[in-house]
Design a protein with these regions (language model features):
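Intrinsically disordered, low-complexity N-proximal targeting/linker segments that flank membranes
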Residues: 1-81, 86-91, 108
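Short cysteine/histidine-rich zinc-coordinating motifs and their immediately flanking basic loops
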Residues: 120-125
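Flexible loop/turn segments at secondary-structure boundaries
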Residues: 84-86, 116-119
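Detector for Asparagine
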Residues: 18, 48, 62, 72, ...
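Residue-level signal for functionally critical sites in structured catalytic/ligand-binding pockets
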Residues: 77-79, 105, 114, 144, ...
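C-terminal, well-folded lobe of enzymatic/effector domains
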Residues: 127-169
Length: 169
């Protein structure tokens, strides 16, 4: 995520082959946090999830909420937590202002949940607490956070929406 390999692939590979760098050398948690925070800060507004986001959300989902609570064999889809339709309605300008393509706005949902959900939140379709466990295990926005995000969208308060998305990331 630090783009250490971009445009220096062969040179960088030689550094590892000659042992001036080593994949086996652990970085500190602080170094990782700094690199991750910088990567989050460098995100640009948009709506389509990039390869890096898809990769990270797949790893997270498989190590957390998908591994324990969702049946095997189920088909999954990437989902915009703040629905794409709602983001498009609030931010249709170019360039975009909302980080709809961010890690904080992405999760996997089983197709059976995602298709009927459309532009709603999981809270809006959570009849009889049907999705409460998924909401908890996926680190979905709290109801209060989701309400703040919807109010900020309505008010075109892009910074507040982006702040919530960055925080969830």
């Amino acid at each position: 995520i630090t783009s250490a390999w971009s445009s220096h692939g062969d040179q960088r590979l030689m550094e590892y082959c000659n042992s001036s760098r080593d994949y086996g050398t652990r970085i500190s948690e602080e170094q990782f946090d700094q690199a991750f925070d910088q990567w989050i800060a460098d995100q640009t507004p948009g709506i389509n999830f990039g390869k890096d986001i898809k990769c990270l959300i797949t790893i997270h989902a498989n190590l957390s909420y998908l591994s324990a609570s969702v049946p095997n064999g189920e088909t999954f889809e990437l989902e915009h937590i703040i629905a794409r339709k709602r983001i498009d309605a609030a931010d249709s300008s170019r360039p975009r202002h909302i980080l709809g393509n961010s890690l904080g706005n992405c999760m996997y949902l089983p197709r059976g949940i995602n298709n009927p959900k459309k532009d709603k939140t999981l809270y809006e379709i959570n009849d009889h607490n049907r999705y409460s466990q998924l909401i908890k295990e996926s680190q979905y926005f709290s109801e209060d956070e989701m309400q703040k995000a919807m109010q900020a969208l309505t008010a075109s308060d892009y910074e507040s929406v982006n702040g919530l998305l960055r925080e969830r990331s």
